[in-house]
Each structure stands twice: as C-alpha cells, then as structure tokens.
C-alpha cells in the first residue's frame, strides 16, 4: 500500500503525468452567451458558424470555469478479487491513487464511490493528499468477495451535479449508462480470464455467490467460454462506441499510468 502511494505520487507530481490531461483541466471556461463582435477585438474569437448564420460577426462570451468535481465509482463485484499477476482490486487501488492525485494537482475536488445495490462507501469531496490516501485505503482494504452490484448506481450518480465520472469495473454485466456526467469507462481485466489454460477437472469457488463449482476446464469448455466472453465484450464495445463514451481496457499486468495518460490527453 505504501509503495503504491509513493509510486503514484511520483508519477503525478514528478511531472510525468500529463501536461496534457485535458479531462482535469477542462477548457478553463464556461459558456455564457453569444454577442456581436466589437471592432478591435481579437478576430480569433469570432465564431464563424454563428456569424454565417446571422450574416455578421459574432463571438461567444465565456466565464472562468470553476473547479471540477471528479468522482471515481467502483462497481463492486467478487470477480474483482482475481488476478494472475496481481488482483484486479489492487490495480483499481492504483488507478484511484493516480486519478486522485491528478485531481488535486489541478485543484479539483475528488470523491470515491464503491457501489453494490446501494452506495457502501462514498467519501466526502477532498482536495488534500490525506483525503486521497484515505480513499485509496478504502479500496485497498475493501472485501469484494461475495459482492455484486445492480444498475441502480445510474440513478444514484445522476442525483449529483454534473461532474467528471470514472466508472471502474470488469463489466461482465453490461449496464445502460444513461448518465448526465462526462463519463470515462475503465474496464479492468486479467489476461487469464480471457485466455484461460487447460486445467482438466477442477473445483472452483464462485467469487460472487461463494458457492463451490466442480467443472472440467478442457479445451472444448475453454473455447466455449472464450467465445462467450468475446461476444459479450464486443457488444459492450459497440455500445460504448455508439454512445461515444471514452474508455480504456486495462489488464492487471499493465501499468495503468500509460493507459490513463493516453485516455485523458
């Protein structure tokens, strides 16, 4: 845990993370109104589409943008307590650290939500390093085994004012994301889940129901499983693309820093 915090802070505050993290900087301004261009103003401010419509030059007026609200929502599931390189839940802890420190670096408020069939953890918005460390600890120490979420999280999140939302899970369930927030989907997986090895007959524990399962992980069973996962994942990708959600799939063997930097630039 301590190593995770130190590593994340070094990447964020050591100037490695994103001089171009536009998600955290916003565009610096809020749109207020349209008005006619005044002679002598910077011509770069002219909105040419609107000017063409009204046949005279117009500019958009903006106000300085207030601080952003950053919400990280982890969709709780027992399947997050799995990993061949490291647990998916440990990867999520690192992601929360990176996003949290990035938020306060740009003087924004950060809060963490862990959701099952109701919010089980929802931290107060913070702009302090201690607040971020506390949020990371809540994820790191959380017991995901035997847990699962339902789709009521959408209504819960829509109760809050418009924010930048990071939705984190392994998405074996595919919710309809009718969210009013600027939403980024972080899809957490382990390579073994999508490409398991043959193990023959084996006893497993369902991480959601905690029931014991006796199964045969032979070649045919694995091929069926892979096809089913590929089919559902393809459907989810098509949905995210259709609805224009920005998303990144991050595996447990990967460094999330680079995936996040690419997503948020």
Predicted regions and their residues:
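A short, compositionally biased
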Residues: 109-110, 136, 196-200
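Structural motif
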Residues: 168-172, 252
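Conserved beta-strand segments of the P-loop GTPase G domain that flank and frequently precede/overlap
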Residues: 73, 167-169, 185-188
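Von Willebrand factor
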Residues: 128-163, 173-174, 190
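An amphipathic, basic-hydrophobic helix/alpha-beta surface used to engage anionic
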Residues: 1-123, 164-166, 241
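Short acidic, S/G/P-rich loop/turn micro-motifs used as interaction or catalytic elements
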Residues: 79-80, 172-176, 192-193
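Short, electropositive alpha-helical surface patch
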Residues: 122-137, 238-245, 265
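Von Willebrand factor type A / integrin I
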Residues: 1-25, 33, 159-162, 177-265
């Amino acid at each position: 845990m301590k190593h995770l915090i130190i590593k994340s802070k070094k990447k964020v505050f050591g100037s490695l993370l994103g001089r171009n993290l536009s998600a955290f900087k916003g565009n610096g301004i809020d749109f207020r109104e349209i008005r006619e261009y005044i002679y002598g103003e910077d011509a770069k401010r002219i909105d040419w589409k609107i000017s063409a419509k009204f046949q005279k030059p117009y500019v958009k007026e903006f106000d300085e943008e207030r601080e952003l609200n950053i919400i990280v929502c982890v969709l709780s599931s027992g399947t997050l307590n799995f990993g061949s390189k490291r647990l998916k839940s440990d990867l999520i802890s690192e992601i929360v650290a990176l996003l949290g420190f990035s938020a306060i670096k740009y003087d924004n408020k950060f809060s963490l939500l862990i959701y099952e069939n109701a919010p089980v953890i929802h931290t107060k918005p913070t702009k302090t390093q201690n607040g971020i460390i506390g949020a990371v600890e809540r994820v790191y120490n959380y017991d995901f085994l035997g847990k699962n979420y339902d789709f009521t999280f959408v209504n819960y999140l829509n109760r809050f004012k418009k924010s930048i939302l990071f939705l984190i899970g392994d998405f074996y369930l595919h919710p309809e994301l009718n969210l009013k927030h600027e939403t980024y989907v972080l899809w957490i997986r382990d390579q073994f889940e999508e490409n398991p090895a043959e193990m023959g007959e084996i006893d497993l524990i369902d991480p959601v129901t905690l029931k014991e399962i006796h199964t045969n992980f032979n070649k045919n069973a694995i091929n069926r499983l892979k096809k089913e996962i590929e089919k559902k994942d393809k459907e989810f990708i098509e949905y995210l693309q259709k609805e224009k959600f920005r998303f990144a799939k991050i595996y447990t063997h990967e460094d999330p820093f680079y995936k996040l930097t690419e997503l948020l630039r």
